[in-house]
Amino acid sequence: SALMMVIVTSVSLMVHIYTIGYMSEDPGYQRFFAYISLFTFSMLMLVLGENLLVTFLGWEGVGTCSYFLISFWHTRDSAATAGKKAFVTNRVGDWGMLTAMFMAFAAVGTLSYEGINHAAETGGLAAVTATGIAMMLFVGACGKSAQLPLYIWLPDAMEGPTPVSALIHAATMVTSGVFLLTRMAPVLHAAYPWSGDVIATVGALTALFA
């Protein structure tokens, strides 16, 4: 979390500075700064949350802001379409994360990372339950981190102003899925071994074909 906080704030600072000049002549200057500031706040909430609920609030925040930013020039049909594609695709991933949260709470009685991971490490989480949670979290990660088959929104994200592409692509939003799986590593370890193979295979196929 500390490392991600440094990365998010550093990248965001550079993007904000670049935006001052890049968007200076745009009539939506103030609106754009409001969006990227809210995006940064949401990303920090995502990486600093102590439990899955706070992380999910940040998760939804960056998803909503990505829609606002990608479709910023909404008078262009291509930008409006790209924004809607990003919004809908990420909702599929959100369904996966919500399902994982419900499963974790039903099994452990808490949404705290510490509580869930402790249960996974001490055998308090059955392998079948851990596998279900891991796979649903991976569905969420596929949406945010643009993995197959939910990668289709990312190329169209270029329809937004250049600072948007920098903020979304440069070690912030697209890394949030990887960050989530890393924080839940004990659950992945408690899951059936094939779950790791699924994650690795999808990642490799995304790298080759997406």
Sequence positions of predicted segments:
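...captures the hydrophobic TM-helix bundle architecture rather than a specific catalytic motif
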Residues: 1-210
